[in-house]
């Protein structure tokens, strides 16, 4: 069963990245090919008990890929347009990647993060006040959640 879950996680990850990169326009292809880093928005709980956001760079090895991270499963989610989830914490430490549609996360201080297709979030605010989420734009938001086996905050590929 674990073997099947791992395979599904890998297929989903590869599919998500291919979908993201395949959606690039011709003008963006050159930029995508010359990028040296993969960025993600880390949502974490600060010492004040509030959720905060920061942009992080995922560490890339000489093979142009991150080190392999163990996942415990994969979940695809469709969030209907207009859905709002009031203050909540992440259910576990996980990556969430927007595949289509748009969303928005709000953290402490009213800071809002726009979630466009291809946006990678590292959710680490599993305690404290949490964050809000909403589906915005013209269509449902489709995303993939990849729970990490290592639940140690701050250890994801950086």
Report each predicted region and the residues it spans.
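A short glycine-rich, His/Asp/Glu-containing loop-to-beta-strand
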Residues: 47-87, 93, 141-144, 149
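Short beta-strand segments in beta-sandwich/barrel cores
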Residues: 84-85, 102-106, 120, 151
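Signal peptide processing junction and immediate N-terminal pro/mature segment
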Residues: 22-32
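Short, conserved beta-strand element in jelly-roll/cupin
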Residues: 89-105
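N-terminal secretory signal peptides that target proteins for export/translocation
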Residues: 1-5
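Short loop/turn motifs at secondary-structure junctions and domain boundaries
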Residues: 33-36, 86-88
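Ligand-binding loop in jelly-roll beta-barrel domains
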Residues: 72, 110-112, 116-119, 125-152
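Bacterial N-terminal signal peptides
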Residues: 9-20
């Amino acid at each position: 069963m674990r073997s099947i879950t791992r395979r599904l996680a890998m297929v989903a990850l590869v599919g998500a990245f291919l979908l993201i990169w395949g959606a690039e326009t011709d003008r963006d292809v050159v930029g995508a090919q010359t990028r040296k880093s993969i960025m993600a928005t880390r949502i974490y709980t600060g010492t004040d008990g509030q959720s905060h956001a920061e942009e992080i760079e995922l560490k890339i090895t000489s093979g142009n890929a991150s080190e392999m991270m163990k996942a415990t499963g994969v979940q695809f989610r469709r969030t209907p347009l207009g859905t709002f989830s009031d203050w909540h914490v992440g259910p576990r430490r996980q990556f969430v990647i927007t595949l289509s549609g748009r969303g928005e996360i709000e953290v402490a201080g009213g800071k809002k993060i726009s979630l466009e297709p291809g946006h990678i979030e590292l959710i680490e605010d599993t305690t404290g006040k949490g964050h809000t989420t909403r589906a915005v734009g013209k269509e449902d938001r489709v995303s993939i959640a990849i729970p990490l086996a290592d639940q140690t905050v701050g250890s994801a590929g950086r």
